[in-house]
Amino acid sequence: MTELIMESKHQLFKTETLTQNCNEILKRRRHVLVGISPFNSRFSEDYIHRLIAWAVREFQSVSVLLAGKEAANLLEALGTPHGKAERKVRKEVSRNRRFAEKALEAHGGNPEDIHTFSDFANQTAYRNLRMEVEAAFFDQTHFRNACLEMSHAAILGRARGTRMDVVEVSADMLELAVEYVIAELPFFIAAPDILGVEETLLAYHRPWKLGEQISRNEFAVKMRPNQGYLMVSEADERVESKSMQEERV
């Protein structure tokens, strides 16, 4: 992986690209898709403000990606009733959106460029990509297992975050929670097709084991040449080199 330091008048950010192709996309700095997770204490108003300020300074165009309705599945997997889970997700995503809108407006970005997974549910490009992911999930055991492993880590991470004692993660819990992974993956492999941009980097603060496997061509699902992944951290913290093993929602 390639590591760079980007300096501004206010804040240092460290970036790490997943592949050499990601690094080439980064050099051109045409577009970045900033990922913001719900129920993650990192994404405070101040952090989102700093992150988006950095993104607007460094890239020609900035979009923000928020969770969709599938985030409720993780809460349901841990026992939250369906209706309550949906309400909690709507409230949290609204909070994330409000902070992102405020930051984009403050730094010259476009508040209209904030999206959730669910916004594209009926879009042809997104639906085709999701079908591609779902086909691999059902046809390739090793891809299915990798997705379920990510869901397992997310369930345990969410349980830790809420101080819940989970004795065993059942198959039903995994099947419910994995919907979030499936909904998110199209933005990892081909976000330009969805957003209508030439190329982009999906920016997040951690490595992603499943993404690393995709970038190594271990599955039928492939990252497109105009798609990259970028790990971003503030200078006083370390971009973790270990594979991601915490919740993304």
UniProtKB/Swiss-Prot annotation:
It comes from Bacillus licheniformis (strain ATCC 14580 / DSM 13 / JCM 2505 / CCUG 7422 / NBRC 12200 / NCIMB 9375 / NCTC 10341 / NRRL NRS-1264 / Gibson 46). The record marks 88, 98, 180 as: Could be involved in aa-tRNA binding. This is Cyclo(L-leucyl-L-leucyl) synthase. It is an enzyme of class 2 (transferase). It holds the Pfam family CDPS. The keyword Secreted does not apply. Changing residue 158 to A: Moderate decrease in the cyclodileucine synthase activity. It catalyses: 2 L-leucyl-tRNA(Leu) = cyclo(L-leucyl-L-leucyl) + 2 tRNA(Leu) + 2 H(+).
